[in-house]
Amino acid sequence: MLRAATNLYSPPNTGKMSPKTIGSDVGIEVIPVMTGTFLSGAMMSLFLLTIPVILETTTVPSQLLNQWHRIFYRGHIQGPLISIATGLLYSYAAYQRSQRGAAWKPFAVSAAVTVAMIPFTWVFMANVNNSLFRAVAVTEKGGEGNWNEAQGLVRSWGAWNAVRALFPLSGAVLGLLSTCKIVSF
């Protein structure tokens, strides 16, 4: 009877990976999933919280454009850095998996999808960004700016940013599904 109770706490060796091995493998794979999810959440919070609040509480075009410009300035430095770091972490996880003979391609795809937000910005958001920069330049020279134009541009930028946030989120979902061994290719 005592032996049976002991076996409850010490399961027999089934030939599977030990908890120590599983933990170290999962740790390498979970870190980029966490950073990708963090990046997507930070970006999505702009669309869901920040942009609506500044649109609801700002009545002067120059102030709205200045607030957007500060958001852009911080994001254009931090976002790509986190995206690239996350892509490198996914690449490292893919490399580690390939060394073990495990399915590594989902992590390579996660890396590519996460970093794809950068060229997406250059290609699809350049027009709205440039229009906003021109509007900001007008207000910096003492002009008031046009409320409807400023509001429309900031709304458009927020929507494009929400789409862009789906890149690191997609990478994180694929990375998580691969970590849990639900997806493999």
Swiss-Prot record:
Q: What is this protein called?
A: Monooxygenase hypC
Q: Which gene encodes it?
A: hypC
**EC number(s) reported in the record:** 1.-.-.-
Which family does the entry's similarity section mention?
Belongs to the anthrone oxygenase family.
InterPro entries listed in its UniProt record: Anthrone_oxy (IPR013901)
Q: In which pathway does it act?
A: Mycotoxin biosynthesis
Q: Which UniProt keywords apply?
A: Glycoprotein, Membrane, Monooxygenase, Oxidoreductase, Transmembrane, Transmembrane helix
What is one GO cellular-component annotation here?
Answer: membrane
What are the transmembrane regions?
35-55, 75-95, 106-126, 165-185
Topology of the protein relative to the lipid bilayer: Multi-pass membrane protein
Disulfide-bonded cysteines: none
One annotated GO molecular function? monooxygenase activity
Kindly summarize what the UniProt induction comment says about this protein's expression: Expression is positively regulated by the dothistromin-specific transcription factor aflR.
| Positions glycosylated per UniProt | N129
Indicate whether Transmembrane helix appears among the record's keywords.
Answer: yes
The record's PANTHER family line, in alphabetical order, gives: ANTHRONE OXYGENASE ENCC, ANTHRONE OXYGENASE-RELATED
